[in-house]
Amino acid sequence: MSMVYLASGDSNANIEYQTISSTATQQLTQEQSERLHDRITKAQLQKLYDLFKSSPDQMVGYSELRHMLEDVDITFTDYTYTRLFLKINQNSDFMIDWNEFVSYLIFGFQEEDPSSQKEALTMPISAPPVVRKTEHRSAVCCITLLKVKSDQTPMEEIPELSANYSFGGEDSPENSGMWVTASREGQLRFWSAHMEPLRSAVSESSNLPYAVYCMSYAFYNNGKTHSKLVLGDYAGNVRILSYSPYLRGPFQAKPGAALVELVWADVLKGRIPLLIPREHINLHSELISCVYYSLHMNTLFASAEYRNTKKYRGRCPGLIMVSNDDRNNFRIPLGVSVFYVAESKNILVTGGPDTFVRIWDVYISSEPSAILTGHNGGIVAVFVQPEENKVYSVDYHKVIKVWDLQEHTLLQTFGELVRIIHHSETDIKYYYHSHLRDLLVAGRKLIQIKCCPRVRVDLTDGNTHAAPVSVVLYNRLFRNIVTCGLDSYIIVWDPWTGRRKIIMKNCHTKMIYGEIIDIEITAACFDPLEQFLLTGARDGSLKIWNYNNAVVVRNMSIQPDQEVTAVIWVIDRILAMGWDRQVTEFNDVAGREYGDPKKWAKFHTDDITCADVKLGEGVVTATYSGEIIFWKLETGQPYRRYNVMNPYQFIELKLNTEEEKLTRRSKRISSLMGAGRRTLVLQNFKPDEIKDYGANIPVSVQAVLFLQKRPMTKDHGSVFISLDTGYIQVYSHHQHGGFIKQFFAVHKVGDCVLTMASDRKNRFLYTGTAFGYIKIWHIVNYCIPQAEKTEVCMPRLRLDFIFLRKDLFLTRAKRVIRNQPEPMLVSSYKGHLKAINSIGFINLPKILFTGSHDYSCRLWTQGGRYLGTLGTVLPWSKLTPFERAGEDNRAYRLPPDIKKVASSTTLKVISGIQHTGTVKRAKAVDEREDERDVEEAASDVKNMFDRPLREPILGHHFQLPGRSVIEQRIDLDTTELCIPVYTHLRVYPSEMMEHLPTPPVIGQVRAENYLDHYMPVVGKVDPHDSAINIREPQKRAKAGSSSLLPARAGYSLGKPKTNSVLGMPRSSGAGLCKPRTSFTLSDYTPGNPKADFSSRNMKSNLSSGSPKAGIPKADSSHGSAKASCRLGSPKPDYISIKKRASFSPGTTPKTDFSPKAGKPKTNTMKSSNSH
């Protein structure tokens, strides 16, 4: 497109819109920059100022500014100067004053400020805390980290730039270490870095003059410096133990001693040569609250609290720094509770009971360099992240505040600990893991908080936004990429360096109940000259931005609480459409910007989902119900209407007032049910025949695209319509045109195209799907007359797109379209894990960019090579707007998240490497060699044995036994060249099994019948009572009984209590067998299973009943219960039967008067089968 604007009074000065395009027809021989910042000097700037002041009205036009720059020896080509003039002219009046000129220079220098790159997209503490139980009996009183790598690093080993990313190695135990928690009962618990319990131990007190309150340990990883163990006690003394870490120093294991105890007096006398002690007696007059030893500075830091203000009068040495014999006192009111030393920054951060956080220079103790105020309680923990320039402080009320170390400003206040920890818990311990960037909070719970964690580059390349990316645009004037997200952020990126130039937060907001809520940005576009940005939000608001300085130029709105789904900015007009089902037109003419907007006729019956425009010809809009309407751009009148379910049907453009009323009423009803739910469309106009419009037309339109180079004829397909079924329909926007063709654009069930784009000449169609796939279609000869079709050079396409090269097998993306001749699919690969919401193309460098629901915006070459993710922490690829990307034939890497789920097609396209069939042929050669070796080995065996053995090898007089359950390992003799296997087979002779006699006890039990011992029960049912009236049977003695069963054993010698209906015993105590007082195992022999069964039977009979039913009472007249057992010895053994069941409360266990024991023993039934 080409539009001409009159720049000034000079009629020869014309500015064409096409000149701002990166694909201008001018052939650029070399890269030219229109930046003045690198070429202008102070003297030249002063001369330009004088020229501006001498100009009429202190304003200059297009040609005047060029002459002024040439007067100060600054020259540009016509193409470069036109771009420069449009960048400076922010008011779009083609007249520049001194303020505009200086503002352009100021904003350019601000873009080069490194501090602008440090602003984070998310808060330092954005992840929810992890909470788990401590597994201690009481609250944790101490917490520390058992680590292998030290936090202190020699200065010569510290890198100049600390990387804000990691490769995942910090999760290893060697790097992360183990957490150790202790409680007041003396219990220690060891935890992994991810708070998984490992083991527990018990601590003991040491023999020191005073109890130790705090400790610190300093060491280097290289082991070249003596390690320091610092102890601070309750009396204000500090003791230092120094030793060499070579061969573990004093911690060497000694044979026979699992624990080595040391007495401090022996350490002072030098009886332990490996330890070098040093004492600082009465360093403070109060207890030592915190200690630290810096190996780099060879300095000891010790702090104490001085809460007695009357005694110290505010001049207390809260922190003392001891270096050799020199002492420096940091005098702070009320003393210091905690401090942190950042050696790389040479700063010291202190916190105390006075609620202030002070930042000191380590070498200046007279006054702090900054005082951070904002806490309402005493400071109990502080730590610093030097690589992020952040200071974290925690107060007594469990509120965490994050501060900027350079600007000394508050970044975040995190108060989730107040909700998680009960208010009665005040003694909370904190420890910061500097390697993992975790803050561990310990009380009665363990809480792990991520503090500005590093980016795991082995899992992701980073994020572009803090929420899904909704719109990605390329500005051809400033040559940058603008991304808008659902986090209400607008970010300007330099795609050639990967740097973030400008970030605008909280762009669309709304106040609800006094709280400011961010509104998601859902649509955006540029003005015709691409100097301003128009954004639309989910609440119906519209804003025009001068995004180079983050200034809102104008505010607009469609109907309230109606999402804006598409915005179009043409000359002098702005079109916005969305859930209000109509097109709203705003004026963009100077002097008429703030008039009432114009509402186009409401012909749609459902929410508008997408729209596109072709300058000078028309606008197309599509709805959620599948309606498509073509409008005249000049008049705003519709001229064609289609439905995607039946695109050949003619639909009359008729607006009924009754339909509009019913539609408005349904809209109000649906708004009450929630803004996220789609409205019900009323098709019939009669109230008694209201039907759901979505039931008849379930297919919705996801995206529309106008091909700008296709002419407006009925034979040219100029509009592409994407449906949620995966198809793309092609229409002609001519008055007599209509539906032409359709093709299937996805290869997975349930997938659909969400966004489309094309290059400047409409040769390729770029699509992004809901499953994260990027597909490129060759549409040069698609839906055009036969006479205009051109020949396609397939070798050239195969060079550009590796997807077209032949594969060993037909991949899934190719199988779906094998019967679809046009359009030709030239590339298909997975670019994101989630849906692609926006896609665009930069023509001259042939770069494709995509914005996805996975918070990232990625750049690709046209062939599918991965260039990078905007916002990544990794080094950026070298790109230029004047050279084609991806022509250096280097190895391109894959996104880490895609690498784990990529198919063979995606791996081939992104990496640019196709494996040929040479590997298969080499493998066949190896297989032939293996077969040749097998044949040679078989021939050697044949030659050794002269002739092969005949089947059956073992003859007909032997039958192989069944396979044993137990695995029998065969040890072969491998000393000989060949092993006859059959000589090693184990053959066992068959023997007859000996039938063992059955013990009399078993036979007697088997012959018994329960009917001999139980009699029928006489009873009747009383309907007025709640139980069965059963008459007790009369007791009778059985002749010849060996013993009498007591009544408390639960048995009666007569009729037992039974159920009157079933005739079964009512007591659940015993089984069906008659209990016995003694038993004899006289026939027991080793290996007799039947004899062993008697003991098990007795065990089951005794254990299945009640505690009293199965155990006979010992009778002194008959002696004790005896059981003789023949186990090879003539003398019988006495076996005491113990009861295994537990006694009920309140009962007294029975005793066993065993002659072998000599005294009564408690009967706990114990029957063993170990005989």
Swiss-Prot record:
Record's keyword terms, sorted: Repeat, WD repeat
Keyword Repeat attributed: yes
PROSITE patterns (UniProt xref): WD_REPEATS_1, WD_REPEATS_2, WD_REPEATS_REGION
Swiss-Prot/TrEMBL WD repeat ranges: 157-201, 331-370, 374-413, 464-503, 516-555, 603-643, 748-787, 831-870
Top-level taxon of the source organism: Eukaryota
Alphabetized Pfam families for the sequence: WD40
Polar residues composition bias: residue spans: 1094-1106, 1161-1171
Database matches in Gene3D superfamilies: EF-hand (1.10.238.10), YVTN repeat-like/Quinoprotein amine dehydrogenase (2.130.10.10)
Keyword Metal-binding set for record: no
Region (Disordered): 1076-1171
InterPro entries (UniProt xref): EF-hand-dom_pair, WD-EF-hand_domain, WD40/YVTN_repeat-like_dom_sf, WD40_repeat_dom_sf, WD40_rpt
Name the record gives this protein: WD repeat-containing protein on Y chromosome
Organism: Drosophila grimshawi
Taxonomic lineage from the root: Eukaryota, Metazoa, Ecdysozoa, Arthropoda, Hexapoda
Gene that this polypeptide is encoded by: WDY
